[in-house]
Amino acid sequence: MNNLEFLVKNYQTPPEAISLVENSRILLLAGISGAGKDTTKKHLLKNEEYRDIISHTTRQPRENNGKSEQNGVDYNFISKEKAEEMLKKREFIEAKFVHGKIYGTSVVEIEKANQNGQISVTDIDIQGIAEYKKMSERVVAVFILPPDFETWRARFANRYSSAEEFEKDFAKRLPEAISSLEQALEVPYFHFILNDDFRNTARIINQIMHQDIEFNYKDIEVRVRARKLLEDIRMKFDEISADK
């Protein structure tokens, strides 16, 4: 275990940061890749009441559809030395070590939203959401679902210029999707939302943030759809595995 991994494993959110989370309006978006998290977030951010919380990472910028990720827009790209400094100074709300890289949300990002009276919004993985929920039950967690397996597959395919490239990457994404759905369905705090229209999805999320909507029959109904999607993805994964 290297020093950075050790620092993350033993990282403790400072009390003042926990208090900040408890007294903030925070919206966390999760979902399988291709479900529409980014597009939904963009619709929400058209409303000036929301502020995008940009995570820090030590990984290098990637290219998506021929366009390179931008520092300060997609992520705050930092060096390992800077990450180590921030961890030692306890400047993160939460941090994790994934495939040799650091990912984390800084205290400063949440403070900026609070100073402007805004709702902090970010897309984050299941583990990160669990860390936030330990700090405050007021944090709103939303899991975005595609309408069904075939729609999800079609949306995902639109990202690729060749069918061969798509099929290769799609097969790799199936285990990740299975894991995310399994973990999300195991906990009670997610609002599952069926993303059949990005504008409508953003509208529903905005209602949840402002009306403190309790879980109701609709949540139960969409959870059933989530389980069906999980079954379909497992079936496809088993099919691909059997063909190898």
Kindly give the residue locations of the regions a language model identified.
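Post-Walker A helix-loop "phosphate-sensing" segment adjacent to the P-loop in P-loop NTPases
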Residues: K46-I54
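P-loop (Walker A) phosphate-binding loop of NTP-binding proteins
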Residues: I32
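ATP-dependent small-molecule kinase phosphotransfer cores
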Residues: T57-S120
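Hydrophobic anchor at the beta1->P-loop junction of P-loop NTPases
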Residues: L29
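Small-molecule kinase domains that catalyze NTP-dependent phosphoryl transfer to phosphate-bearing small molecules
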Residues: A163-H210, Y217-K244
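Extreme N-terminal, non-catalytic leader segments
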Residues: M1-I26
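Walker A/P-loop
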Residues: K37-D38
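Conserved phosphate-donor/acceptor-positioning beta-strand/loop module used by diverse small-molecule
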Residues: S120-D125, K134-N158, L194-N195
